[in-house]
């Protein structure tokens, strides 16, 4: 039995007691965690609610404290409850049987495998334009999305992870312009170039630099100048070729460029433990006529109209009220421009309808990448797949989370409202914008990465990146810098490790540092990334939490197997041996015992925190909890002689608690995407 299940058992007992004793049906029973363990493990303010309901039903006025006294005896009958006290005007404070619960928590619970039978939820994240290498802003998106996926799965949800590939957009077109008109390369020459590049300067890095050159090319070499309309025509020519697709040589060149960038980006994300189920390509949405189908559905539903006058004459728009009335938000409601081209909002509505299984069309599919652990990444395609292809069913989710930065809040609102207008029965709540703020760099981080700063920039709290200007930090460079810093720390702490083990450990520490730093701030917070702060082994950091888990493993490596086995046997005796139960209860009593018990109770809140994170869509809460658990275990480790304790019962309790913390802390870190190395 988990702590959550025990709490539910107590709630149900109160419902039964309220029904049988007072003839009142409670819809829900709220519970609170007392601020200190000596006040109880769980408090129910239900007596006050019952007093109101009884008066409404019978007109009789009852004292909440008297109601609490009648409920008290019912709760005391539960095996896992040691005692119940009534506090104040009628609070019911429940004290658990610490010894029994320790024995219960020491036995690992089997994971719930019912997710396959549950309605599917979908999370789209990362979704980087495939025109160059990923940067630090993309990493925040990917880490947030990946962690939220892990949270949903831990909460028992069935999840499909999608990565939208905008391979027909302006950004890809600009890089194609660069290859064709600046580099003077055809497809074969680009392939030869790609093959010649080394591991330190990969294809996505080359495209990064080329993209910056194209931006200057459009402005005749002057960054602040207006764009040359004649040169911008080259972009439009490429965009038309991408729309045509098929055997168009420019479209084929663009497909190679986009696909290679996707492969490089996937390699970057793999370094952070981030994977996907499906790559949904915009070219396939275009060529399989998803938009035409969505346009028809929108016309039939009467949610789109063609403007005949004013500045939007000739455009198809959704006539929703703007919440700000700004020109920018008015333009977001345009679905088809007067020249017949579809806006991003229009394409997003078509894609969202497909994700929710309401479009009436589907993609064709192919395997894009197979991972060594059996995970397969699929990609959409326009061509019909081979007959008998065994693949998962994609799309058809009941809820879709789109991880997109907060600047897209209003367009995402339009998408949700547009989909709900076409299919009213699913409502706007089926489309959830998982928004977040930007990530920048601290001035110190910029200097570590070799970015030149002016005196004015050095005085700023953070430096904002700009991909088009070439002012940015590639994700791989960021990871490499973190690995170098982590390696120096690992070499200092563990000089006896082999070079391979040092590098492997440094990688895990670097990933922990980066992921935790990006997760510990709430989504609506602008982050200024700082290497020194992220890599610190002290304070609220990934390495600190990691080190606490490493320490639990170190304890069990040092303990003799027979000592651990004896501890397990003794703890198992609690359930059927009253004398042993009393001895364990004695260890967990008093001020010192209560501190140990508080740590155990904190560890058992993980399930509740996971559910809270799922409901609030805020991974930062799990990061904060993980740090709290790591910090509490560190205090426990320093306060108790786990390895040298002579008393058998006390030693067994300390070992059992350490084992519980190891399980819960490792699980929490895993959901954050952080592995626990052997040594640090």
Feature roles, as predicted:
Residues 2-102, 115-680:
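Non-catalytic interaction-recognition regions
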Residues 103-108:
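Short, charged, solvent-exposed linker or helix-capping segments at domain edges/interfaces
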């Amino acid at each position: 039995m988990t702590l959550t299940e025990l709490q539910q058992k107590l709630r149900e007992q109160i419902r039964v007691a309220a029904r049988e004793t007072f003839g009142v049906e409670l819809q829900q029973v709220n519970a609170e965690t007392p601020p200190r363990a000596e006040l109880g493990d769980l408090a129910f303010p239900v007596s006050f609610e019952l007093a109101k309901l009884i008066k409404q039903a019978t007109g009789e006025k009852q004292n909440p404290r008297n109601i609490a006294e009648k409920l008290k005896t019912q709760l005391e009958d539960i095996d896992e409850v040691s005692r119940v006290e009534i506090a104040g005007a009628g609070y019911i404070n429940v004290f658990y049987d610490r010894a029994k619960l320790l024995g219960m928590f020491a036995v690992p619970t089997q994971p719930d495998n019912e997710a396959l039978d549950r309605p599917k939820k979908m999370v789209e994240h990362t979704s980087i334009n495939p025109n160059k290498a990923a940067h630090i802003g993309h990493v925040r998106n990917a880490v947030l999305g990946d962690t939220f996926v892990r949270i949903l799965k831990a909460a028992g949800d069935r999840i499909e992870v999608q990565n939208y590939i905008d391979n027909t957009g302006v950004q890809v077109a600009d890089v194609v312009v660069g290859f064709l008109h600046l580099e003077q390369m055809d497809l074969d020459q680009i392939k030869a170039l790609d093959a010649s590049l080394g591991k330190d300067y990969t294809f996505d890095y080359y495209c990064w630099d080329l993209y910056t050159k194209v931006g200057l090319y459009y402005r005749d070499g002057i960054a602040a100048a207006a764009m040359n309309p004649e040169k911008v025509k080259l972009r439009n020519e490429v965009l038309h070729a991408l729309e045509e697709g098929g055997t168009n040589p420019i479209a084929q060149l663009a497909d190679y460029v986009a696909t290679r960038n996707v492969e490089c980006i996937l390699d970057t994300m793999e370094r952070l433990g981030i994977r996907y189920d499906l790559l949904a390509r915009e070219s396939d949405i275009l060529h399989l006529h998803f938009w035409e189908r969505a346009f028809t559905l929108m016309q039939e539903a009467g949610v789109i109209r063609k403007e005949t006058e004013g500045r939007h004459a000739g455009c198809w728009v959704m006539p929703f009220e703007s919440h700000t009335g700004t020109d920018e938000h008015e333009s977001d409601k345009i679905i088809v421009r007067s020249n017949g081209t579809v806006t991003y909002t229009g394409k997003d509505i078509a894609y969202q309808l497909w994700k929710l299984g309401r479009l009436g069309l589907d993609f064709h599919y192919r395997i894009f990448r197979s991972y060594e652990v059996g995970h397969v990444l699929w990609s959409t395609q326009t061509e019909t797949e081979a007959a008998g292809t065994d693949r998962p069913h994609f799309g058809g989710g009941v809820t879709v989370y789109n991880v997109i930065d907060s600047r897209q809040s209003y367009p995402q609102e339009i998408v949700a409202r547009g989909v709900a207008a076409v299919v009213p029965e699913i409502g706007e709540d089926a489309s959830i914008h998982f928004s977040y703020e930007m990530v920048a760099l601290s001035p110190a981080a910029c200097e570590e990465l070799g970015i030149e700063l002016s005196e004015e920039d050095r005085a700023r709290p953070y430096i904002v990146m700009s991909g088009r200007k070439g002012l940015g930090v590639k994700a791989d460079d960021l990871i490499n810098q973190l690995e170098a810093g982590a390696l120096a720390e690992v070499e200092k702490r563990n000089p006896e490790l082999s070079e391979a083990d040092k590098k492997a450990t440094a990688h895990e520490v670097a990933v922990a540092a980066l992921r935790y730093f990006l997760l510990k701030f709430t989504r609506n917070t602008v982050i200024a990334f700082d290497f020194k702060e992220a890599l610190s082994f002290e304070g609220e950091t990934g390495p600190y939490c990691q080190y606490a888990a490493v320490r639990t493993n170190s304890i069990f490596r040092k303990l003799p197997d027979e000592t651990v086995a004896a501890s397990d046997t003794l703890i198992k005796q609690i359930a059927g041996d009253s004398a042993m139960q009393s001895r364990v209860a004695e260890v967990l009593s008093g001020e010192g015992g209560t501190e140990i018990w508080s740590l155990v109770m904190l560890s058992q809140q993980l399930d509740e925190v996971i559910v809270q994170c799922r409901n609030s869509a805020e991974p930062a809460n799990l990061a904060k909890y993980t740090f709290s658990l790591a910090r509490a275990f560190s205090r426990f480790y320093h306060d108790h002689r786990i390895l040298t304790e002579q008393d058998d019962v006390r030693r067994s309790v300390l070992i059992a608690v350490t084992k519980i913390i190891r399980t819960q802390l490792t699980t929490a870190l895993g959901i954050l995407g952080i592995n626990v190395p052997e040594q640090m």
